[in-house]
Amino acid sequence: MMEFTIKRDYFITQLNDTLKAISPRTTLPILTGIKIDAKEHEVILTGSDSEISIEITIPKTVDGEDIVNISETGSVVLPGRFFVDIIKKLPGKDVKLSTNEQFQTLITSGHSEFNLSGLDPDQYPLLPQVSRDDAIQLSVKVLKNVIAQTNFAVSTSETRPVLTGVNWLIQENELICTATDSHRLAVRKLQLEDVSENKNVIIPGKALAELNKIMSDNEEDIDIFFASNQVLFKVGNVNFISRLLEGHYPDTTRLFPENYEIKLSIDNGEFYHAIDRASLLAREGGNNVIKLSTGDDVVELSSTSPEIGTVKEEVDANDVEGGSLKISFNSKYMMDALKAIDNDEVEVEFFGTMKPFILKPKGDDSVTQLILPIRTY
């Protein structure tokens, strides 16, 4: 038996976050449900697809406001999406849930009444246990940044599963996050304080994307704990657990060429918008290819679509070292890389027409984007 009354709006927000861990395609039918556990002083919501698990604790009061009133402790598993849709459409400000011994759950709000068939919570798989020792603490703002600057470059193809994740390497009080789909590479470096243990793990890109949606900007810090095959992110009232990917992440340091032939400094916004315009035709051509040529403090971008026509853009460079060069690249990769550099000025280093080139914020080595060119010349 379980019975509690809860503020509907607050409940919806927490349920929506819990749903992010639930997949309709699961081998265990019970995992399409949300586990609700009413304890003496809190209600705990759990969602999982066995890769990602989200556990949210709802306290009795938040900022001095009463949120939930628990009359009887107990637990039940309710069909996830149905249940959340019902709660969203209920008329009242409060919702009351009560269950019987068969886990039939009565949901009432205003003049509405729903009866749902619940499942036995004892059948719900136990969440992975992650020890709470040795936390790494980051600010939410920094972690959101790290995800935005690397996660877009993970591979979407399952042929090399390790590349669908971001490699987190912790050594000598530095965190190095690397993502690559073998056509481009994103690296973000970050100084940490007093980290005793070195780590080398691969966190699934999908998990980081979901975590990013849940972290609210008003939370300040997030604690990160690692187990042998799991990682736990603890932020506010949310525990977010993800399975780590197995396997060895390739050594990407050797991809970075040594001495550049040409280095230029350019306005990020102008460069981005010029590529964006040129890509209108590149996309029509079906291959997203844009040609770039450098010379005399000007960068020229061009693209051709046989059916539609041609485009030419010129962007002034602030600083050019070296001679002239022609190179072709995928416009989407370039725009993603520029978006990940939150600096007004970008440095681009070219090493030759068929060698990878590098983008980074001017005067800052903490973010590096590497892109492989396309052979057209």
From Swiss-Prot:
Keywords: Cytoplasm, DNA replication, DNA-binding, DNA-directed DNA polymerase, Nucleotidyltransferase, Transferase
UniProt-listed InterPro entries: DNA_clamp_sf (IPR046938), DNA_polIII_beta (IPR001001), DNA_polIII_beta_C (IPR022635), DNA_polIII_beta_cen (IPR022637), DNA_polIII_beta_N (IPR022634)
SUPFAM superfamilies the UniProt entry points to: DNA clamp
Locations listed in the record: Cytoplasm
Any one Gene Ontology BP term: DNA strand elongation involved in DNA replication
Entry GO MF terms: 3'-5' exonuclease activity; DNA binding; DNA-directed DNA polymerase activity
Signal in keyword set: no
Keyword Nucleotidyltransferase belongs to the record: yes
CC terms in the record's Gene Ontology section: cytoplasm; DNA polymerase III complex
Domain of life: Bacteria
UniProt cross-references to CDD domains, sorted A to Z: beta_clamp
Function as written in the Swiss-Prot or TrEMBL entry: Confers DNA tethering and processivity to DNA polymerases and other proteins. Acts as a clamp, forming a ring around DNA (a reaction catalyzed by the clamp-loading complex) which diffuses in an ATP-independent manner freely and bidirectionally along dsDNA. Initially characterized for its ability to contact the catalytic subunit of DNA polymerase III (Pol III), a complex, multichain enzyme responsible for most of the replicative synthesis in bacteria; Pol III exhibits 3'-5' exonuclease proofreading activity.
NCBIfam families: dnan
Assembly description: Forms a ring-shaped head-to-tail homodimer around DNA which binds and tethers DNA polymerases and other proteins to the DNA. The DNA replisome complex has a single clamp-loading complex (3 tau and 1 each of delta, delta', psi and chi subunits) which binds 3 Pol III cores (1 core on the leading strand and 2 on the lagging strand) each with a beta sliding clamp dimer. Additional proteins in the replisome are other copies of gamma, psi and chi, Ssb, DNA helicase and RNA primase.
Family: Belongs to the beta sliding clamp family.
Name of the protein this chain belongs to: Beta sliding clamp
Lineage summary: Bacteria, Bacillati, Bacillota, Bacilli, Bacillales
